[in-house]
Amino acid sequence: MSVNDPLGDMLTRIRNAQLRGKSTVSTPASRLRAWVLDVLQAEGYIRGYEKKETENGQGELVISLKYFEGTPVIRELKRVSKPGRRVYMATKDLPSVRNGLGVSIISTPKGVMSDASARSANVGGEVLCTVF
């Protein structure tokens, strides 16, 4: 099956797994997905992830989801920049998610990072998604 938006597919898998109360979810591996998961883990939205090899050689990422008192830690997960409409922002224009309670994940020339890290590094880039 062909997926036009691999990152959007991963975010949807995470959202659906949390709605069902699953402890883990798997998704095909890619570097961009792993970088986004690194930011989610650093910000405390997931427990972690590990890469496992599959028979076809591509590999998969097994994501351990995080809950607090039975409710998902991630309340809202939105894709901002989509394949049909890319969204780029300068440092001064980076959005604040829910008055600073959430996080935007930005793809910058210095790598994938949170909005706070991008502001401190004074770099802008493509706004991949927002998490609250």
UniProtKB/Swiss-Prot annotation:
Q: Which PROSITE patterns match?
A: RIBOSOMAL_S8
Q: What Pfam families is this protein classified in?
A: Ribosomal_S8 (PF00410)
Q: Which GO terms describe its biological process?
A: translation
| Family stated for the protein in its record | Belongs to the universal ribosomal protein uS8 family.
Describe its assembly. Answer: Part of the 30S ribosomal subunit. Contacts proteins S5 and S12.
**Biological function:** One of the primary rRNA binding proteins, it binds directly to 16S rRNA central domain where it helps coordinate assembly of the platform of the 30S subunit.
Name the record gives this protein: Small ribosomal subunit protein uS8
Species this chain originates from: Cereibacter sphaeroides (strain ATCC 17023 / DSM 158 / JCM 6121 / CCUG 31486 / LMG 2827 / NBRC 12203 / NCIMB 8253 / ATH 2.4.1.)
